[in-house]
Amino acid sequence: MSVFDKVKSIVVDQLGVEEDEITLETTFADLNADSLDIVELIMALEEEFDLDIPDEDAEKIRNVGDAVNYIKENQ
């Protein structure tokens, strides 16, 4: 499973959206995620990929592509 597919699966689980709504360009705001949703999403990504994402980096992750790129660069 690719990083994108794993991230997409986590977004679907965390935000309760349909998988076909998610592309690399999809922002979390597009999916009606509030700040708490985003914190929980970042925590789920950290757990899945065994990463520690500092707050200053988490603030830069605004869409699915940002998350995928961050994970690929820091794994």
From Swiss-Prot:
<dbReference type="InterPro" id="IPR009081">
    <property type="entry name" value="PP-bd_ACP"/>
</dbReference>
<dbReference type="InterPro" id="IPR006162">
    <property type="entry name" value="Ppantetheine_attach_site"/>
</dbReference>
<keyword id="KW-0275">Fatty acid biosynthesis</keyword>
<dbReference type="GO" id="GO:0005829">
    <property type="term" value="C:cytosol"/>
</dbReference>
<keyword id="KW-0963">Cytoplasm</keyword>
<keyword id="KW-0443">Lipid metabolism</keyword>
<dbReference type="GO" id="GO:0009245">
    <property type="term" value="P:lipid A biosynthetic process"/>
</dbReference>
<keyword id="KW-0597">Phosphoprotein</keyword>
<dbReference type="InterPro" id="IPR020806">
    <property type="entry name" value="PKS_PP-bd"/>
</dbReference>
<feature type="domain" description="Carrier">
    <location>
        <begin position="1"/>
        <end position="75"/>
    </location>
</feature>
<comment type="similarity">
    <text>Belongs to the acyl carrier protein (ACP) family.</text>
</comment>
<keyword id="KW-0276">Fatty acid metabolism</keyword>
<dbReference type="Pfam" id="PF00550">
    <property type="entry name" value="PP-binding"/>
</dbReference>
<comment type="function">
    <text>Carrier of the growing fatty acid chain in fatty acid biosynthesis.</text>
</comment>
<dbReference type="InterPro" id="IPR036736">
    <property type="entry name" value="ACP-like_sf"/>
</dbReference>
<keyword id="KW-0596">Phosphopantetheine</keyword>
<keyword id="KW-0444">Lipid biosynthesis</keyword>
<dbReference type="GO" id="GO:0016020">
    <property type="term" value="C:membrane"/>
</dbReference>
<dbReference type="InterPro" id="IPR003231">
    <property type="entry name" value="ACP"/>
</dbReference>
<dbReference type="GO" id="GO:0000035">
    <property type="term" value="F:acyl binding"/>
</dbReference>
<comment type="pathway">
    <text>Lipid metabolism; fatty acid biosynthesis.</text>
</comment>
<dbReference type="GO" id="GO:0000036">
    <property type="term" value="F:acyl carrier activity"/>
</dbReference>
<feature type="modified residue" description="O-(pantetheine 4'-phosphoryl)serine">
    <location>
        <position position="35"/>
    </location>
</feature>
<dbReference type="GO" id="GO:0031177">
    <property type="term" value="F:phosphopantetheine binding"/>
</dbReference>
<protein>
    <recommendedName>
        <fullName>Acyl carrier protein</fullName>
    </recommendedName>
</protein>
